[in-house]
Amino acid sequence: MEEISWDDFTRVELRVGRVIGAEPFPEARKPAYVLRVDFGPELGVRKSSAQITDRYRPEDLVGRLVVAVVNFPRKQIGPLMSECLVTGFADAEGRIALCVPDADVPLGARLV
């Protein structure tokens, strides 16, 4: 494992957002959803593609808090311009479990 400096870590903006929309993304190469995530007044709403269809249904995602990287460059994924990277962990079968705060925190709160 490569070590990084504290300065490297602090450059990554991991923020809390609330999923306000989730819909299938049929144009994606692998099964995915298009998520709309609200990061509060400072950052607003951003879109992301998330390969989480094995574990979550769209209706179960709306209203959930998630942790996302918000300072990566935007990335074109098929017809979608992804504006953040929603984070998660893969289980033994490769299914993604979302990284979520275990308490209610303000939208846009930064991981410290």
Question: Predicted regions: what is each one?
Answer:
Residues 1-112:
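Phosphate-backbone binding interfaces of nucleic-acid-interacting proteins
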